[in-house]
Amino acid sequence: CVTTFFTGILPIILFAIETFLPNPGDYSFIRHGVAGNLTSKWWMTNENITENGMYGQKGILFNEAIWGAFKGTLIVAVCCALLAGTIGLLVGYCVSKNRRSKWAAYVNNMAFLPYLMPSLAVGVAFFVFGSSMGIFNTYLLLVLAGTVKYIPFASRSALSSMMQLSGEIEEAAIIQDIPWHKRMLNIIIPIQKSSIISGYLLPFITCVRDLTLFMLLC
C-alpha cells in the first residue's frame, strides 16, 4: 500500500496541486499555511493576457487549442480502438479455431509483430507512406498507424479469451445451423465479453497516452 501511494497516488495529487500554484514549483503556501496563495488562473482565465505568467494563453477550461487537441485525441483513440479491437477479435477467433495449422501460427506471429517494433520506427514508416500517398497530417494516417501498432494488444486478449471457451458450445450452435454472425453476437461475445472489452480498452488507453508514434504524423 505504501509503495502504491508513493508511486501512483502521490504523483497525481502533486500534479493536481501544481495546477493551482501561482508559479511552477512554488509550494510556499505549505510553509506559511495560507491557502489563499493558490490561484485558479491556469484554469479559469478566459482572455489572452501576457502578465501573471500566462504568456498570451487562456486557461485550460477556455483554451480552444487544448480542447481541439483533446477532441482530436479522442477521435483517433476511439477509431483505433474500434478497428484494432475488431481485427484483433477476428484474428484471435481464427487462430483459436485453427490452432494446429501453420497458417494460423503465421497469422498469429504477424499480428504480434507490430508490438516488437519501436513506436518511432512505425511512425517513420507511416510518415514515408503518408507522404507518398498524399494523406500526411490527416486523421486517416493517424488511425491507420494506430490500428497497426495496437492490433497485438487486441489479438492477444481475444486469443486468450477464445482459448478458454469450450469448442462444444459453438459446435452445438453449428449443429442447429445457426449462422456464424449470430454465433458470435449471441453466444461467443456475451460469454467472453469482459476479455473482449479489454481488447478494445487496451488500444484506446495506449493510444491516448502514446506520443512517440504520432509526433511525426501530425
Locations of the language-model features?
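Solvent-exposed soluble domains appended to multi-pass membrane proteins
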Residues: R183-M184
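Short alpha-helical segment that forms part of, or immediately flanks, the ligand-binding pocket
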Residues: E170-E171
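Membrane-proximal transmembrane or re-entrant/amphipathic helices at the cytosolic face
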Residues: G33, T39-W42
